[in-house]
Amino acid sequence: MDVTRLLLATLLVFLCFFTANSHLPPEEKLRDDRSLRSNSSVNLLDVPSVSIVALNKKSKQIGRKAAEKKRSSKKEASMKKVVRPRTPLSAPCVATRNSCKPPAPACCDPCASCQCRFFRSACSCRVLSLNC
């Protein structure tokens, strides 16, 4: 009985070791530069060379001025409000926070939209965007 338990324990340890070892990626042992060159997937001759060029003072100033122009144009664009053309109000319309089930007419507020919940059982006109 003890021999079978010892055999089963050894088998269990072997299976655990084999399972853990099979999930690890294989390690590559490179011995010298020749094996490194033969095993590498990227050929170093195919990569284009990179040249570093020093900038003079004039090009730095032009770059700084262009960056400042971009910053100022972005600030001006963000400060300007986009004016949306208002749709003419139709006579039969639904006020904000009132029920607006699909056969009902559109919402009176142009910034509001009909929002339904619970599988379109409860619908109401709501203003979604505060910037409108």
Curated annotation (Swiss-Prot):
The lineage of its organism: Eukaryota, Metazoa, Chordata, Craniata, Vertebrata. Residues 93-132 form the Agouti domain. GO terms for biological process: adult feeding behavior; cell-cell signaling; epigenetic programming in the zygotic pronuclei; generation of precursor metabolites and energy; hormone-mediated signaling pathway; melanin biosynthetic process; melanosome organization; melanosome transport. One of its GO terms (cellular component) is extracellular space. Residues 65-79 have a biased composition (Basic and acidic residues). Keywords: Chromosomal rearrangement, Disulfide bond, Glycoprotein, Knottin, Obesity, Secreted, Signal. It is found in: Secreted. It is linked to Obesity and hypopigmentation: An autosomal dominant disorder characterized by early-onset obesity, overgrowth, hyperinsulinemia, and hypopigmentation of the skin. Some affected individuals experience hyperphagia and exhibit reduced energy expenditure. It holds the Pfam family Agouti. Glycans are attached at N39. It comes from the Eukaryota. This is Agouti-signaling protein. Involved in the regulation of melanogenesis. The binding of ASP to MC1R precludes alpha-MSH initiated signaling and thus blocks production of cAMP, leading to a down-regulation of eumelanogenesis (brown/black pigment) and thus increasing synthesis of pheomelanin (yellow/red pigment). In higher primates, agouti may affect the quality of hair pigmentation rather than its pattern of deposition. Could well play a role in neuroendocrine aspects of melanocortin action. May have some functional role in regulating the lipid metabolism with adipocytes. Widely expressed at low levels. Highly expressed in the skin. Expressed in adipose tissue. It comes from Homo sapiens. Residues 1-22 form the signal peptide. Disulfide bonds join C93-C108, C100-C114, C107-C125, C111-C132, C116-C123.
